[in-house]
Amino acid sequence: KQKILNTKDSVSKIANKIDRLGLGAPIASFLIRIAAVESCYGLNRRAGNNIWQVDPIAFKDTQNLSSHPGLKSKFKILKDNGIDWPKLTYTQIKSKPLLNAIAARLYIGNMPGDIPKDLKGQANYWKSNYNTSSGGGSTYEFIKKNSGDGTSGCIDYV
């Protein structure tokens, strides 16, 4: 259990760093919850370093200025922080947790509506917008993995 909490702490630091970049409203708690359900904070070896399970289509969406002109100002913020987002490849963002978190944040920023603050609301938002019907997760799983200290359901990966 301690290993899970240590890993969750690392994910929390990354999520809070993403908030400090200023790519949109602060959503660190939602990013942490996504990491819990998508990869058990990266402990699920099948996820590799793709902690937020950003797929190639979602990644392309984070670089698509035609569909999402609001990305332009976010690219400038990233460039000012030494990250030339339009030049990155999927392989790069999949293998580096910070870039993976940025991809998740940009992808979420392209979605409609505000992110709910409560766990059930976030579970529904995640399933409707992030995991979608083609993803294998459920709102029940999102809630279960994010209840209590956030270690439920991750014990199998330690």
Language model region names:
Residues 1-16, 22, 33-112:
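Peptidoglycan-targeting cell-wall enzymes and recognition modules
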Residues 25-33, 118-126:
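Alpha-helical scaffolds flanking conserved acidic
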Residues 39-46, 114, 131-140:
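Secretory-pathway/luminal and periplasmic proteins that interact with or process carbohydrate-rich
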Residues 111-119:
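Inter-helical turn/loop segments and adjacent helix faces that build the functional surface
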Residues 123-158:
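Long, amphipathic alpha-helical surface segments
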